[in-house]
From Swiss-Prot:
Similarity-based family: Belongs to the UPF0441 family.
Protein name per Swiss-Prot or TrEMBL: UPF0441 protein KPK_0672
Pfam family, one: DUF1190
InterPro entries referenced in this protein's UniProt entry, alphabetically: Biofilm_formation_YgiB (IPR009576)
Bias (Low complexity) ranges: 177-193, 209-223
Annotated region (Disordered), positions in chain: 165-223
């Protein structure tokens, strides 16, 4: 009877480990790469108007005015729209809403809602985020909204058109945000029901807290 060749268990274990751990290593690497991509990678400043920007950036008054003007135009294009003043005020508070012409691209059923006045209602732009003014390039900007109704999830917060919050509505702050935060938002093509924007803010806040918790857990596991 032939003797069975002696198995090199050490070599076997190494081979098995390398073969089976490689995918895990790749997965871990992918996670860290994704985490790196999601890190805050752009510094922005929060201003209420062009004067605030000019005061913080001496000699850049023209650029500040242009950025503010562009932010206002972007707000008109992307802000939540309401069929009635009452719906907007219920969300953002008294004195925080303005009429805006019914724009092209709005769904026909929503256009019909505004036929009597020829316009919708939208929140006033409370401030805007602006990227750094560097060289001769024009800085990006993103309009921000805020509610003065204590019952709204957006109360006292700076939020963009998607409902994502950027903290307390206090101009003059500088913060780091993902580059995606400065990307243009889609134009508003439907009206929002009363309380609808607040729901979006609440959902976004929940997602942000969940993401922050996951990041914290990952760091804890990593030691």
């Amino acid at each position: 009877m032939k003797r069975t060749k002696k198995i090199n268990h050490s070599s076997f274990r190494k081979s098995w480990s390398a073969r089976h751990l490689t995918p895990v290593a790749l997965a871990v690497t992918a996670v860290f790469m994704l985490a790196g991509c999601e890190k805050s990678d752009e510094t922005v400043s929060l201003y209420q108007n062009a004067d605030d920007c000019s005061a913080a950036n001496p000699g850049k008054a023209a650029e500040c005015t242009t950025a503010y003007t562009n932010a206002v135009k972007e707000a008109e294009r992307t802000a939540p729209k309401y069929a009635t003043r009452e719906d907007c005020v219920a969300e953002f508070g008294e004195g925080q809403c303005q009429q805006t012409p019914a724009q092209a691209g709005v769904a026909p059923e929503n256009q019909a809602q505004a036929q009597s006045s020829g316009s919708f209602w939208m929140p006033l732009m409370a401030g805007y985020m602006m990227g750094r003014l560097m060289g001769g390039g024009m800085a990006q900007q993103q309009p921000l909204f805020s509610s003065k109704n204590p019952a709204s999830p957006a109360y006292g917060q700076y939020t963009d058109a998607s409902g994502k919050s950027y903290g307390a509505a206090q101009p003059g702050r500088t913060m780091n945000v993902p580059k995606t935060a400065m990307a243009p938002k889609p134009a508003t093509t439907t009206t929002v029901t009363r309380g609808g924007f607040g729901e979006s803010v609440a959902k976004q806040s929940t997602m942000q807290r969940s993401a922050a918790g996951s990041t914290s857990s990952s760091r804890s596991m990593g030691g």
